């Protein structure tokens, strides 16, 4: 993580030199990270669409093999192979983004910004007005609504945004800006 942290810190300073604002630098850094991860995000979208298209067939298999779970699992795996679908394909971009998130968290927690951004007095401290945590919850909810392939995840679509909003209360404002901008793109 040290190399990634150093690279993100360098990029943050580079974008600050371009913009003159660490808030804008974080937004530009977020867009750069999203651009770097775009091929994985596209792959995730395709995988989710393929899984969504297979839902009717999977439900039919579930009804047909409801008393034979082993046979059901075998048939589902055959269905995945037949349609060249990887059920874990949607997870990869999220897993790849985690090191970026952790490294950025470390950078923003230790970074001395010297100035604030908009209403924020420090990008290293939590948002005292809770505007960013609310935005993080709202944008997480919108993103989940746009990308969810499974109706059975409805409870998660409400729990996850509330959880993200809650934990964002204590995160550095710069990290929450990253999360919000990342959700929007």
PLM-predicted stretches and their roles:
Residues 1-185:
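Helix-loop-helix
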């Amino acid at each position: 993580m040290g190399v990634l942290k150093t690279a993100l810190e360098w990029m943050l300073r580079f974008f600050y030199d371009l913009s003159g604002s660490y808030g804008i630098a974080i937004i530009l850094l977020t867009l750069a990270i999203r651009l770097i991860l775009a091929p994985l995000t596209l792959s995730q979208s395709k995988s989710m669409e393929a899984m969504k298209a297979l839902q009717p067939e999977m439900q039919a298999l579930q009804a047909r093999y409801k008393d034979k779970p082993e046979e059901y699992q075998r048939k589902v795996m055959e269905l995945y192979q037949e349609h060249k679908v990887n059920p874990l394909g949607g997870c990869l971009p999220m897993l790849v983004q985690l090191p970026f998130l952790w490294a950025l968290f470390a950078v923003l927690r230790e970074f001395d910004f010297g100035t604030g951004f908009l209403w924020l007095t420090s990008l290293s401290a939590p948002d005292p007005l809770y505007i960013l945590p609310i935005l993080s919850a709202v944008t997480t909810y919108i993103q989940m609504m746009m990308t969810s392939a499974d109706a059975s995840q409805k409870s998660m679509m409400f729990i996850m945004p509330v959880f993200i909003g809650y934990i964002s209360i204590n995160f550095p404002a710069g990290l929450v800006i990253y999360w919000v901008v990342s959700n929007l793109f």
